[in-house]
């Protein structure tokens, strides 16, 4: 039987989602829990592999089990033993050919920034602090330039190992908040550090160090050295996973291009 689990977690005290040789990860917490239940190793398969310090409001993984536990009890059984910085929101059965990664057709990230004269210790790890005044309108105009299908070679980590760095963004916008702004981006998939590089670039635009008109040129150059900054992980949230293409079409229109993850790698 294949089970799909929806979870949320605060990333401050994790080295990321994926198992690391030394260190605490989200995958490690769940596989340790499932091993106790099954008396054997059970591998989980996530929709996304968040990095160290990145939070998730909605994340999914699936695993296979032979245990005859009522579906209504899985959530309780997991939450009673999980640490306080992880929570299981829902557990359902899925078809045996369902795959959490390959059936994912889109993801949405939100990057949270607060602006003030002084750093707020109560925001530490949850939002990124920027004391400078930024031109949010200009930043939003630059953000809109990323919507569509582009080669994001110049806007991801040089450690990205995948062959194709072409991704499609359905949404890319700056939204003003009471204490700063959020950057919201939805796409077919994301390269390693791509969202954080986009945020860092948009902040440079807000400071007047780049222009809106620079975006097409930087995309065309495919040179990471032209965008050398990466925003901190602490303000980044994996906000939504699209497992249903109809939901994606509902949010962004029937004309968008749907990508299947069997042709994409990374993120």
From Swiss-Prot:
GO biological process terms held by the UniProt record: tRNA pseudouridine synthesis
Family, similarity comment: Belongs to the tRNA pseudouridine synthase TruA family.
Keywords for this protein: Isomerase, tRNA processing
UniProt function note: Formation of pseudouridine at positions 38, 39 and 40 in the anticodon stem and loop of transfer RNAs.
Species this protein is from: Staphylococcus aureus (strain NCTC 8325 / PS 47)
Pfam families: PseudoU_synth_1
Protein name: tRNA pseudouridine synthase A
Residues forming the catalytic site: 51
């Amino acid at each position: 039987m294949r089970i799909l689990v929806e979870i949320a977690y605060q990333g401050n005290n994790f080295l990321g989602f994926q198992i690391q040789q030394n260190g605490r990860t989200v995958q490690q917490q769940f596989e340790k829990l499932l091993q106790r239940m099954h008396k054997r190793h059970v591998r989980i398969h996530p929709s996304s592999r968040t990095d160290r310090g990145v939070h998730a409001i909605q994340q999914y993984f699936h695993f296979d089990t032979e245990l005859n536990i009522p579906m209504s009890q899985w959530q309780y059984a997991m939450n009673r033993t999980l640490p306080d910085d992880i929570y299981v929101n829902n557990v359902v059965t899925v078809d045996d050919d369902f795959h959490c990664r390959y059936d994912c057709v889109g993801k949405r990230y939100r990057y949270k920034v607060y602006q003030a004269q002084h750093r707020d210790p109560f925001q530490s790890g949850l939002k990124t602090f920027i004391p400078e005044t930024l031109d949010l309108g200009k930043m939003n105009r630059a953000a809109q330039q990323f919507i569509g299908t582009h080669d994001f070679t110049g806007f991801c980590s040089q450690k990205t190992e995948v062959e194709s760095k072409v991704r499609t963004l359905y949404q890319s916008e700056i939204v003003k908040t009471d204490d700063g702004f959020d950057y919201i981006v939805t796409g077919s998939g994301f390269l390693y550090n791509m969202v954080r590089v986009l945020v860092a670039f948009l902040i440079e635009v807000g400071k007047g160090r780049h222009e809106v008109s620079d975006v097409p040129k930087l995309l065309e150059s495919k040179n990471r050295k032209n965008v050398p900054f990466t925003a901190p992980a602490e303000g980044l949230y994996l906000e939504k996973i699209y497992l249903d293409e109809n939901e994606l079409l509902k949010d962004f229109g029937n004309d968008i291009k749907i990508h299947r993850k069997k042709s994409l790698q990374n993120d």
